[in-house]
Amino acid sequence: MLPRRLLAAWLAGTRGGGLLALLANQCRFVTGLRVRRAQQIAQLYGRLYSESSRRVLLGRLWRRLHGRPGHASALMAALAGVFVWDEERIQEEELQRSINEMKRLEEMSNMFQSSGVQHHPPEPKAQTEGNEDSEGKEQRWEMVMDKKHFKLWRRPITGTHLYQYRVFGTYTDVTPRQFFNVQLDTEYRKKWDALVIKLEVIERDVVSGSEVLHWVTHFPYPMYSRDYVYVRRYSVDQENNMMVLVSRAVEHPSVPESPEFVRVRSYESQMVIRPHKSFDENGFDYLLTYSDNPQTVFPRYCVSWMVSSGMPDFLEKLHMATLKAKNMEIKVKDYISAKPLEMSSEAKATSQSSERKNEGSCGPARIEYA
């Protein structure tokens, strides 16, 4: 048995929180030891394997640990400095969801036109997750700008002071291919967009064609410049005569947050383009859905004004850059021709089954790249 004096001292320490302090110290020691071991393992593998080998190794480890409590896979990826594509790549379902939104808007517009009402896109009824009120009803879209070839709506994002925006527009003097390529070409954008401070591709995914970009842009004075790290993927559907580009914010170990800029961590953008005739003839409609959190202390109406006025300005600059590239024959990368146009139905099945085998392919009449 313990001596009475020692037992009394131990009990007194317990009442005063001594036992809790002892347990806390033990937890800190064990946690620190495991973190140091993990860092040592990461350094060892960094010396033994190349970056591509580490990426494959971490991908296998992520699949093994996926679903376990504590998200051990994300911790391992962060320690090894590897971006886990299995979690972050843009999936086919995200592209298809955007295409379905465009089709739904077109169907509603056709209904209005057939009933004798003057042709114009009706109020959109999106199915976007995360925009429902406390009763489970979808937030309604509010018209902000109504012009002949440019219509802008907005709706509140539940639980925030922010809005989601939607644009339906038309251009008749450039081709869909030209507009699409100018939007994707990062090198050309550095020339026509004066707000760009930095824009570069960080990493590409050979499986889906997604790629991660780092974009730094000026914001109106007196705000600091913002930087975005986001993943994007596009698809060109020849059979349904549509193009789609989807982007959203991610975290990447190669681009840590900088004190020079304000990191925008919430950002989503989906654009769908419907040619009036073909990809190489003038004329198309487009549907752009956009939301982000610029991390500003300005009131809601100020942020809303900046976005609702900045979006038409950006789209017009994009349009003018496309016209300039067309008229002056400026060389712009042709993303639509970046991959073969046609594949057999047998090849399509092989492509779908090989996505998990890290073999990038595309379906029939569909070209996918970032």
Swiss-Prot record:
InterPro entries in the record: START-like_dom_sf, START_lipid-bd_dom, START_lipid_transfer, START_STARD7
Location in or out of the cell: Mitochondrion
Keyword 4Fe-4S annotated: no
Molecular-function annotations in GO: lipid binding; lipid transfer activity; molecular carrier activity
Post-translational modification note: Proteolytically cleaved by PARL.
Region called Disordered, residue ranges: 111-138, 343-370
Main location: mitochondrion
Tissue: Expressed in nasal epithelial cells. Down-regulated in nasal epithelial cells in patients experiencing an asthma exacerbation as compared to stable asthmatics and healthy controls.
One Pfam family matching this protein: START
Record keyword Coiled coil present: yes
Domain START: 112-327
Site (Cleavage): 77-78
Single biological process term from Gene Ontology: mucociliary clearance
PROSITE patterns in alphabetical order: START (PS50848)
Gene Ontology CC entries for this record: extracellular region; mitochondrial outer membrane; mitochondrion
Keywords: Coiled coil, Mitochondrion, Transit peptide
SUPFAM superfamilies for this protein: Bet v1-like
Coiled coil ranges: 86-111
Transit peptide, residue positions per record: 1-58
Role description: May play a protective role in mucosal tissues by preventing exaggerated allergic responses.
Entries under PANTHER family matching the protein: PHOSPHATIDYLCHOLINE TRANSFER PROTEIN, STAR-RELATED LIPID TRANSFER PROTEIN 7, MITOCHONDRIAL
Official protein name in the record: StAR-related lipid transfer protein 7, mitochondrial
